[in-house]
Swiss-Prot record:
Pfam families per UniProt: HSP70
Keyword Ribonucleoprotein on entry: no
Keywords (A to Z) from UniProt: ATP-binding, Chaperone, Nucleotide-binding, Phosphoprotein, Stress response
Name the UniProt record assigns to this protein: Chaperone protein DnaK
Annotated GO MF terms: ATP binding; ATP-dependent protein folding chaperone; unfolded protein binding
Length: 600
């Protein structure tokens, strides 16, 4: 019986790679064309499906050739081809099936399991879509792991004894991620993540395309944008030029028979210098600098604390990228690993760990944004802070806001703002059947659980009745890295204003709760206390109500402190009377009052 092999797959926006563990070492598998990377392109022609290199060649001529489908994963968008609409996961499944097929030929037997990588900022919907794509392709997805984490895993395989902090700079074809990880004793823990979901090597290609269009218009009196085939050829040549300029100072662009001009066929010959290319793409380089700084800040470390800087993605071969990284971090990036293959290698290593082929390696990912629920007054109460290591389960006890409340609504929010309305609403559900009781008495346990694939489950349980409701968060709308970074930035910019709003709401809730409890206590036990003390307490309660109407938070806080002191005296007096009384219920009443005051 053949030993279990779990494929490690980098399902990329531009290219995909598959690797396995062989003799406890990762091996990247070549596709039928002898290449170690496969274009993530699917084409349909005459009811035939074509994947990979052959499909990429049809991008020029076939309108039903589909590229960059990864950008649509987790959305409800579809692509039209072969006289039908395809969901993004269906197209991704065809790429995965192709990788699976040629991997099986190399291995010599069927393979049914895989570890697939995704960008660090893929949300629940995108991760679920990736798992579904694997399922459609006939693969059981054992684990979804973040691409930068996989890269660090590949790099750290032979260095598990040394403690180190690593920054992973991942510039792919369509996405950009920065992660800071800590490696220690075989454990890989993500300290922070940042990035830009709308930045990648394609943007550098597009700058060259724009330059070519302008030059061809000026020198050849021909507009390539007017000819679809000509424009597609420009895009292909732009990618080649970018690659060439990573190794040489000048690259020649040769495009014979690009189109027909006034005087016959147009044969383009142009030269692009690296210095000129770097000047026209300097703004793109700058866009990758801020996420580096943000990732370090989130990890609470300085650049000088980094032991290694890893490069992931073919675009990191550009000298300007490496120079910027070295200048920003004052450290040369490590170029010892193949940036195109390292993510798949890391996925294969994780597969090897799951299959028992590799031991002493533990992978820990994090959640990119804070998760919590909306509580009284519209406050966003966090349960799992951002950058918490996953898998994780956290619980907290909440209660009712009204007397005899038999149902509560659990609103799940994601984000860094202190008010629920300023964050992203992920889902909402009701817990019914709560036993009627005074406000604050029922115990409702809210639990958040994030599994190894980053999928979130939220439950609410009435501790007394045992009634429970659970939802799994599966957003149909994606949250891009750009949106996440914007949310974090907005939280930082509004931190002071949000804190004031939160303080006002919490003070109001605190005051209303205390008034409610004390008025009830005075009604129930007023005969047990001194009339003067009771009169003073009632006067302070009225002053508190007046301040609530005037919305004066600072004065309200001072009055709260005073009334809480009076309430404490009230509780002590009641307790003393209960101790001297022969009636046990009186003692029970005093304890209840004391507990209510402490609760607020």
């Amino acid at each position: 019986m053949a030993k279990e092999i779990i494929l490690g797959i980098d399902l990329g926006t531009t290219n995909s790679v598959v690797a396995i563990i062989e003799n406890q070492k990762p091996v990247v598998l070549e596709n039928p064309n002898g290449k170690r990377t496969t274009p993530s392109v699917v084409a349909f022609k005459n009811n035939e499906e074509i994947v990979g290199d052959a499909a990429k060649r049809q991008l020029e001529t076939n309108p039903e050739a589909i590229a960059s489908i990864k950008r649509l994963m987790g959305t409800d968008k579809t692509v039209r081809a072969n006289e039908r609409d395809y969901k993004p996961e269906e197209i991704s499944a065809k790429i995965l099936a192709y990788l699976k097929e040629y991997a099986e030929k190399k291995i010599g037997h069927k393979v049914t399991k895989a570890v697939i990588t995704v960008p660090a900022y893929f949300d629940n919907a995108q991760r679920e879509a990736t798992k579904n794509a694997g399922k459609i392709a006939g693969l059981q997805v054992e684990r979804i792991i973040n691409e930068p984490t996989a890269a660090a895993l590949a790099f750290g395989l032979d260095k598990t004894e040394k403690e180190m902090k690593v920054l992973v700079y991942d510039l792919g074809g369509g996405t950009f991620d920065v992660s800071v990880l800590e490696l220690s004793g075989g454990t890989f823990e993500v300290l922070s993540t940042s990035g830009d979901n709308h930045l990648g090597g394609d943007d550098w290609d597009n700058e060259i395309v724009n330059w070519l269009v302008k030059k061809i218009k000026e020198e050849y009196d021909f507009d390539p944008k007017s000819d679809k085939m000509a424009l597609t050829r420009l895009k292909e040549e732009a990618e080649k030029t970018k690659i060439n300029l990573s190794n040489q100072s000048v690259s020649t662009v040769s495009l014979p028979f690009l189109g027909m001009g006034k005087n016959g066929p147009i044969n383009v010959e142009l030269e692009l210098k690296r210095s000129e290319f770097e000047k026209m793409t300097a703004h793109l380089i700058d866009r990758t600098r801020k996420p580096i700084v943000d990732a370090l800040k989130q990890a609470k470390i300085e650049a000088s604390d980094l032991d290694e800087v890893l490069l992931v993605g073919g675009s990191t071969r550009m000298p300007a990228v490496q120079s910027m990284i070295e200048h920003t971090l004052n450290k040369k990036p490590n170029r010892s690993i193949n940036p195109d293959e390292v993510v798949a290698i890391g996925a294969a290593i994780q597969g090897g760990v799951l299959a028992g082929e590799i031991s002493d390696v533990l992978l820990l990912d994090v959640t990119p944004l804070t998760l919590g629920i909306e509580t009284l007054g519209g406050i966003a109460t966090p349960l799992i802070p951002r950058n918490t290591t996953i898998p994780v389960t956290k619980s907290q006890i909440f209660s009712t806001a009204e007397d005899n409340q038999t149902e509560v609504t659990i609103s799940v929010v994601q984000g860094e703002r202190q008010l629920a309305a300023d964050n992203k609403m992920l889902g909402r559900f009701n817990l019914s059947g709560i036993e009627a009781a005074p406000r604050g008495l029922p115990q409702i346990e809210v639990s958040f659980s994030i599994d190894v694939n980053g999928i979130t489950t939220v439950s609410a349980k009435d501790k007394k009745t045992g009634k429970e409701q659970t939802i799994t968060i599966k957003n149909t709308s994606t949250l891009s890295e750009e949106e996440i970074n914007k949310m974090i930035q907005e939280a930082e910019e509004n931190r002071e204003a949000d804190a004031l709003k939160k303080d006002k709401i919490e003070t109001t809730v605190r005051a209303e709760g205390l008034i409610n409890q004390l008025e009830k206590s005075i009604t129930d036990q007023g005969e047990k206390i001194d009339p003067k003390q009771k009169e003073l307490l009632e006067k302070q309660i009225q002053e508190l109500k007046d301040l609530l109407k005037e919305e004066k938070t600072d004065e309200l806080k001072l009055k709260l402190d005073q009334i809480e002191a009076a309430a404490q005296s009230f509780a002590q007096a009641t307790a003393q009377q209960a101790n001297t009384s022969e009636s046990d219920p009186k003692a029970d009443d005093s304890n209840t009052i004391d507990a209510e005051i402490k609760q607020d």
